[in-house]
Amino acid sequence: MAKISVIGAGNVGATTVQRLAELELGEIVMTDIVEGLPQGKALDLIQAGAIKGYDTSIIGTNDYAEIVDSDLVIITAGIARKPGMTREDLIKTNSKIIAEVSRNIAKYAPDSIVINVTNPLDIITYIAMKSTGFETKKVFGMSGVLDSGRFASFIAEELKCSKKDVQAMVIGGHGDLMVPLPQYTTVSGVPLTDLLPGDRIARLVERTVNGGAEIVELLKQGSAFYAPSAAIVSMAEAVIKNSKRILPASAYLEGHYGQEGIYFGVPVKLGASGVEEILELKLDESQYETLRKSSETIRNTISQLEI
């Protein structure tokens, strides 16, 4: 049976554990630095199993040693965005947290695959890779699945159709410079560009780019966690089941899309060994330009880090 460890027992981490438990993908360890928090949430989720009908083993702990021999580790630790705070504002605090988390992953689960969820996503994923010392394909970030889901949701709302029929694609940095791709977005196989005029698509793209901030402003405290946890679990399932799904993820680029040595949201094939392949899509010039701006922002931030 697979072993999955979730670092961080906040809203995103605990909701991820709930979804993993309900799917019975493997035994789960949830760890957090706050005493009692992971233990209490684990106990609650264990008792929920009697009602929902799952027998998943769930351990809540403050001890990193419990993640030993994990097949998959999901990082959700760190502080969340507050109203008016950009993802880049998070870098100083979260980079230190994730460096420490990553060193413990390397110590106790050296053969694991790592999915990072902590923001600023692309930069923190780079820190996780460097701090673990793992192969780049074994460390990747959850970004595009969430952003694509938001894009798909807005499209379904606009067209008054089922979300099940929308296949959306968003690449680029996880932040203000993400790149939704209408030409690779379909509704039951029909290109979005055949269904909506450019101005309406542009409004949906703008709302997608601001999707996380919109929720932060409404909540006043904290940020989204239902959709992020759903996105995390879709990626985790692809790894645990070795299903070779094509999903957008923040992956390490080595010449792909003209970029070198950074993490960036791109379509990838996910399986038991992590990122098994990066798919290159043809983009128009404006999309390439946005990617270049996004990558430059990430690169400049990384150059200022002390790793």
UniProtKB/Swiss-Prot annotation:
NAD(+) binds at residues 8-13, 32, 94, 117-119. One of its GO terms (biological process) is lactate metabolic process. Keywords: NAD, Oxidoreductase, Tricarboxylic acid cycle. Its EC number is 1.1.1.37. The active site is at 174 (proton acceptor). It holds the Pfam family Ldh_1_C. It catalyses: (S)-malate + NAD(+) = oxaloacetate + NADH + H(+). The keyword Kinase does not apply. GO terms for molecular function: L-lactate dehydrogenase activity; L-malate dehydrogenase (NAD+) activity. The keyword Oxidoreductase applies. Substrate binds at residues 81, 87, 119, 150. Gene3D superfamilies: Lactate dehydrogenase/glycoside hydrolase, family 4, C-terminal, NAD(P)-binding Rossmann-like Domain. Belongs to the LDH/MDH superfamily. HAMAP family: Malate_dehydrog_3. Catalyzes the reversible oxidation of malate to oxaloacetate. This is Malate dehydrogenase. It comes from Methanosarcina barkeri (strain Fusaro / DSM 804).
